[in-house]
């Protein structure tokens, strides 16, 4: 990820999702489907925010078809630990206009 000026622990401003963010979302899609008991045919990352902690939290708005969106939080540990991405939170029944906030 590009370097950005922000306070540790603070959320960045929302920005358009990149191919890297789509890849992160795709990797945790099975975790979300297991937790929500739903299958998402469409799973397109739209915008994201990030938060530097002991690793990085990615807050991602995902379009799942029609007028439906979900907000997910994905934790990526420090690279040297080589651990898998983990879905640590989600909100369903979101709309295109719902603000992507910390939750």
UniProtKB/Swiss-Prot annotation:
InterPro entries recorded: Cystatin_dom, Cystatin_sf, Prot_inh_cystat_CS, Prot_inh_stefin
Keyword Cytoplasm: yes
Keywords: Cytoplasm, Protease inhibitor, Thiol protease inhibitor
Subcellular location, record wording: Cytoplasm
Site (Reactive site): 10
Region (Disordered): 1-20
Keyword flag Translocase: no
Major localisation: cytoplasm
A GO term for molecular function: cysteine-type endopeptidase inhibitor activity
One Pfam entry name: Cystatin
Motif window: Secondary area of contact: 51-55
PROSITE patterns assigned to the protein according to its UniProt record, in alphabetical order: CYSTATIN (PS00287)
Cellular compartments per GO CC: cytosol
Family indicated by similarity: Belongs to the cystatin family.
Functional summary from the UniProt entry: This is an intracellular thiol proteinase inhibitor.
Protein name: Cystatin-A8
Organism: Sus scrofa (Pig)
